[in-house]
Amino acid sequence: MNLNELKNDWINDFANPMIIAGPCSAESESQMLETARRLKESGAEISAFRAGIWKPRTKPNGFEGVGVIGLNWLKKVKEEYGFKTATEVANAHHVFAALEADVDILWIGARSTVNPFTVQEIAQALRGTNKPILVKNPVNPDLALWIGALERLLGQGIENVGAIHRGFSTYQKTKYRNIPNWQIALDFKNQFPNIPLFIDPSHICGNRTGLAGVAQEAFNVGYQGAIIESHEDPDNAWSDASQQITPEVLADMIGNLQIRNSGISGYEDEMGKHRTLISDMDFQLIELLSQRMKISEKIGTLKKENNIAIFQPERWKVITEYANQKASETGMSQEFIEKVFKAIHEESIEVQNGIMIDR
């Protein structure tokens, strides 16, 4: 059996879309129960209550989770409010403890997905389970690693799986905590339309303001669910406070989302995917142009300090020849590429002029 042959009927037992919500971290029994109570009373259709029991942190000495005791709090949430429960596992010990506590849904985090040894250890510990196991994309944009993690689960007989798109790390400063890079997620969806795909806007945005927009983009292209961080007192959360929202805000956000019929066929569904890719590429273009202009500023400063003219004909000749060559190789119109590079060059000259006259 391969991944394309999986039926993944498990998701049909949940609402569409399937929303998994709860705090980033389990902090105390009262915090868990209060968040669950407010989620229940908010009116939002929440399929499962999530909470991090063990927290892999970027740096040591941060809050790394309450550990096994938090599993008892998840049990109480299930008993008192009827939610299915979900948590992250990062090694065999976590798996055994979570299974013993009868956690309903487990996920493998982005930092684990990057390491095949870790994924293999987790997969072997999960062998034989019929619980849904979700896999977050790796922190780096590597589709093969993401697919490989799911294949390792399948290799251990685990057939109820799903994928979580949580964005990708970047050294550049952007409006996202983790850039969505929609193209990779949609490549995954195109290869495996049978595997439920969830959006994690909390980790993509890293803030509260962009959550709804990212979630809507995902549902526009047929994602089946979302995993969103919600806390009874977000400002005082012990981890990732800036990206968590109250249950009431979450309910309002979910209520305003437009859920697309994943069964739609034809040009509209395909067009939505293409437009999402174009939007992602446009964002990357703007980011690259911004970086290019910052480098132009540095060059302008050097020219000013060394009394060198802004316009360098030989350099411009090299740029245009290279651009025309690449246009020819890629089948693009040389006239179009010349217009683009002339516009970029003019803006670069304007930037450097500003440096020269201290504007």
Question: What is each PLM-predicted segment?
Answer:
Residues M1-I20, K76:
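N-terminal amphipathic alpha-helix/helix-capping segment at the start of soluble metabolic enzymes
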Residues P17-E34, P60-F63, F83-V89, G109-A110, ...:
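Active-site mouth loops of central-metabolism enzymes
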Residues P17-P23, S47-A51, T85-T87, L106-I108, ...:
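Hydrophobic faces of well-ordered beta-strands that scaffold small-molecule active sites
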Residues E34-I53, A101:
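Catalytic domains of carbohydrate-active enzymes, especially glycoside hydrolases
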Residues R50-V68, E232-A241, I299-I310:
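Glycine-rich, proline-tolerant flexible connector loops at the mouths of alpha/beta enzymes
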Residues E64-V66, F83-V95, D104-T118, K131-L143, ...:
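Catalytic beta/alpha-barrel core
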Residues T118-D252, N256-N261, S265-G266:
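Catalytic alpha/beta core domains of metabolic enzymes, predominantly
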Residues I259-R359:
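Extended, charge-rich alpha-helical interface modules
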